[in-house]
Amino acid sequence: MKNDPLRILVAEDSPTARRLLVEIVRADPALTVVGEARDGVEAVELAQRLRPSLVTMDIQMPRMDGLEATRRIMTEVPTPVVVVSTLVERDIQTSMAALRAGALAVLQKPLGPESPDFDADSRRLRDTLKAMAEVKVVRRWPDRTAPPAPVPTPPAPPVSPTRPGVVALAASTGGPAALFRLLSELPASFPVPLLVVQHIAIGFSEGLAQWLRTAGPLPVKVAEDGEPLLPGHVYLAPDDRHLGVRGEGRAEVSRAAPVNGFRPSATWMFRSVARAYGPASLAVILTGMGQDGLEGVRELHGAGGRILAQDEQSSVVYGMPGVVVGANLAHEVVALPDLASRLTSAFRGSGGV
């Protein structure tokens, strides 16, 4: 029933950490714990038997780790999965791979009641579980180790009168996997810098950058304030900082106030890009929950920039791109498999790719 609590399966091998997670979840009457798994094998079995609303997934577990368990669940019994990980390098990289395998979000494992951030971290965990439990996980993108299915070549988009000078991308839920696929298909000769705002838990931005470096030939890094924005380089917004552009083509990393609760904010980035590049701006709104980016896209559209939005079918969550399309601000709505070719086509005949 609509008002029944969401049914959570907790997968965690440490008894202490598992008890803590169960207590945090049970503190919210909108959530209930229906099962506890001590390893990945149990997580898959319980997901099949209990059909929970969502699974919280540890990464390092005996018998089967969280990455393989996520893959199995997404293949055998598609269920929203939220990775709850430590900030250990090995765990961060595996967490990123779990996002590509189908997990919707990654959160830092709460440190315990003695931590000054415990209440805020616990509330963030519960809020994330409630939001992600509503996501319909019914599709998986094929792994690039398998031969890609042939797709028709899309018609060339209308040529913009102004050659883009930057590409600004925004994403939330489902974004890491979408970014990985996009970057795997862009050429090393891509002629302009790419800025990225990806909503992700604090502590995971550097790990995300390291993981995205393995996708393809483009260098990926967390942006530093004042550094020059180089063609064919990808710059991610740092933890809890806005990312934009200074007028002279350098990165601006800012501690300015959050925009509608977000820092980094897609709207902040799009506004900055619109001011710096005007009609030479190209914005891409990828899969994500909520409306971050809408007002910034509105300003970028008014400045003459071009806007692409991911289509509903290839989006994990059609929130961020959906509101842009609904506001009639998108010049094109593009399926994820076609996005790289759309971007490269924007530079054909103008000295670019």
Swiss-Prot record:
Question: Could you say which EC number(s) this protein's record lists?
Answer: 3.1.1.61, 3.5.1.44
A Gene Ontology cellular-component term? cytoplasm
The protein's superkingdom reads: Bacteria
Q: Where is the active site?
A: S172, H199, D292
| UniProt keyword list | Chemotaxis, Cytoplasm, Hydrolase, Phosphoprotein
So which residues are the signal peptide here?
none
Where found, per UniProt? Cytoplasm
The residues covered by the Response regulatory domain are 7-124
Which InterPro entries does its entry note? CheB-like, CheB_C, CheY-like_superfamily, Sig_transdc_resp-reg_Me-estase, Sig_transdc_resp-reg_receiver
What residues does the CheB-type methylesterase domain cover? 158-350
Q: Which reaction does it catalyse?
A: [protein]-L-glutamate 5-O-methyl ester + H2O = L-glutamyl-[protein] + methanol + H(+); L-glutaminyl-[protein] + H2O = L-glutamyl-[protein] + NH4(+)
- One short Pfam name that applies is CheB_methylest
Q: Which NCBIfam families match?
A: PRK00742.1 (NF001965)
Q: What does this protein do?
A: Involved in chemotaxis. Part of a chemotaxis signal transduction system that modulates chemotaxis in response to various stimuli. Catalyzes the demethylation of specific methylglutamate residues introduced into the chemoreceptors (methyl-accepting chemotaxis proteins or MCP) by CheR. Also mediates the irreversible deamidation of specific glutamine residues to glutamic acid.
Please state which protein family the record places this protein in: Belongs to the CheB family.
**Comment, domains:** Contains a C-terminal catalytic domain, and an N-terminal region which modulates catalytic activity.
Q: What is this protein called?
A: Protein-glutamate methylesterase/protein-glutamine glutaminase 4
Q: Which organism is it from?
A: Myxococcus xanthus (strain DK1622)
Starting at the broadest rank, the lineage of the source organism is: Bacteria, Pseudomonadati, Myxococcota, Myxococcia, Myxococcales
